[in-house]
Amino acid sequence: MTTARLKNSAIVGGVASALILAGAAITAAQAKTVKVELTAKEVTAPSDNEGHTFLAWTYNGQIPGPLIRATEGDTIEFTLKNDAANKKSHSIDMHSMRTDVLTNFASIKPGETKTFSYVPDHAGVFFYHCGSDPMIQHISRGMIGAVIVDPKDPDAMPKADREYVLIEHQMFDNPEDVDGMMANKWKHDAFNAVPFQYDPVHDEHATQTLEAKPGERVRIYLVNAGPNEFSGFHPIAGIWDRVYPSGNPKNVLVGMQNYTLAPGDAATFDLISPTEGANALVNHSMRAALSGAIAIVMFSNKADPSMGHGDKILVR
């Protein structure tokens, strides 16, 4: 190699290295810290649309717990508190995290606090729940939630016009009956903890539906919290435009009528309706659907613009 070529090679290499370093610096600068605080609370919560209640175990007094959202590469600083007024030990199991189960996911007693941080390195939608013994009871009584990790590449998926989070789980008649839970004697299957919460067709006491306009891309994040049943997720009168198993943009299926999630699994579903009218999102296991796992999406040119955005992504 001549001296001139050597100099040119060095210059090109130096520029390339500088660009790589600059890109790394930009990526580091874009990454942010997301602080999450959850408090385990044993409270009274609604069990249907008519005002009946049960003694629930929750995160922050809500079922599901708060939606946790970050971008791939962010740092999540997490704190779990077990309210001193509680009677039980509680914990966290985050499916978006790779860690030591014996430390970060260990139970804490009433009045105790646990903190840790992690960097979510896989984009997608993930389940979080209490892992304390008996886990089946902690899940069924309400200690469930969702984590959305958005891809760091904003163009990795088509842009959604609206987003909704649905967390499906079985509800048991007696929340103290662990043997009944193990025997799978559930009474209701519900989206976001209230049977038929978004279905005034099957429950006259239901007061809300999900909303969108025709032609909009509606993105549904479904978490199957179980604790026991699979979910065959189908949009009646529609077809899933795209399905992303685990919500990862690298996993994409097109034109699906139904997609099945195991207990503890999650996926992202895109739905587009060309016309006004209704689609019914169901677990196509009829026992599950007819005991509560139905959510109506109303497609209307007059759809509420706030629905599917901000605090109306997880509609309570």
Residue ranges and their predicted role:
Residues 33, 42, 140-175, 246, ...:
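Extracytoplasmic/periplasmic copper-protein system
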Residues 2-15:
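Bacterial N-terminal signal peptides that target proteins for export
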Residues 162-214:
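Acidic-aromatic/histidine active-site loop/patch
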Residues 34-39, 43-148, 228-261, 279-298:
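Histidine- and aromatic-enriched segments that form or immediately flank copper-ligand environments
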